[in-house]
Swiss-Prot record:
This is Pregnancy-associated glycoprotein 71G. Glycans are attached at N4. It is found in: Secreted, Extracellular space. GO terms for biological process: proteolysis. Disulfide bonds: none annotated. It comes from Bison bonasus.
Amino acid sequence: RGSNLTHPLRNIRDLFYVG
């Protein structure tokens, strides 16, 4: 987490991974 600016898509994927 923290690189959502450089990897916005990864931030969204993280939400699915956590959920």
